[in-house]
A protein has these predicted regions:
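Structured mid-to-C-terminal alpha-helical surface segments
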Residues: 1-47, 56-65, 69-274
Length: 274
């Protein structure tokens, strides 16, 4: 059996166990191999993890699938040259996993969000398998109070782990809730709702610190006044037929969300921000 076939067999087994598409497992495995190298590099403290990859690490891949990686830079300029140089250095670190990384393009992020950054494309190569990876890099986020060092378990062997700097859970939730309030009924990202719900209902967190982080995030993003009328915003979100429909589609798409009703999510968010 070739190395590629052997890896695919291991991935299929885990995909079956966790009820997750095999492509998601493959993508996350390749991200893991990159992050293991980051953990061994001089840039360990300079790339702070956030977003879906961090949520998946906290609640488990079987409770949150993700296909991308989000980071915030600390003590490193947010320029294509600095990002490329750092990533080339990280990818050059040798490991016994036989994965090779090819650094690709760095382009400005032009998403519908209010803060910028860059998207870096890489290819992860293992035998005949080539997996494209996308990493979003931003800077200047309000992390309240500070990043925390977090232990990430490896996909194929949860006795093996690596440590990286990441957002504290209160800041993760604050960014999600600020986005929900800011976008209101125009939100097109059901994962914002899911992430807020799953973190608030399964993890321990400091509610006062969450509130402080929410205020700091809104101040940083310039949305303090925009999200000030929380009762009206939440009433509109609760009554939005479009958001109900969007959530129902998400539930059908992901097994881990199928038993969560939209009204439960709204109740959890209301409880967070009351």
């Amino acid at each position: 059996m070739s190395r590629a076939m052997s890896l695919k067999a291991k991935i299929r087994n885990i995909a079956k166990q966790k009820n997750i598409p095999a492509q998601v497992i493959l993508q996350n495995y390749m991200f893991e191999r990159l992050l293991v190298r980051l953990a061994e590099s001089e840039y360990k403290k300079k790339f702070v993890l956030k977003g879906g990859m961090l949520v998946a690490a906290i609640v488990g891949l079987d409770n949150r699938a993700t296909m991308d990686l989000d980071t915030t830079l600390k003590s490193l300029p947010l320029t294509p040259e600095a990002i490329t140089g750092a990533m080339q250095s990280i990818c050059a670190i040798e490991s016994d996993d036989d994965v090779a990384f090819e650094v690709g393009t760095v382009t400005p992020i032009r998403d519908d969000d209010i803060y910028g950054g860059y998207r870096m494309m890489l290819n992860a190569k293992y035998d005949t398998i080539v997996t494209p990876l996308s990493i979003d890099v931003s800077t200047g986020d309000a992390i309240t109070p500070n990043p925390v060092e977090y232990t990430f378990s490896e996909i194929f062997d949860d006795k093996k782990s690596y440590r990286l700097w990441a957002y504290n859970i209160e800041t993760v939730m604050a960014e999600k809730v600020e986005t929900i309030l800011r976008r209101g009924v125009f939100n097109t990202r059901p994962r914002d709702f899911y992430d807020t719900y799953i973190l608030a209902t399964t993890q321990e967190f400091d509610k006062a610190l969450f509130t402080e982080a929410l205020m700091a995030t809104a101040a940083h993003r310039g949305t303090t006044e925009q999200i000030a009328d929380i009762p009206t915003i939440m009433k509109n979100i609760e009554e939005s037929a479009e958001l109900h429909t969007m959530w129902d589609k998400y539930r059908k798409q992901f097994a881990y969300a199928e038993k969560i009703d939209y009204t439960q999510i709204v109740a959890v968010i209301n409880n967070l921000i009351e």
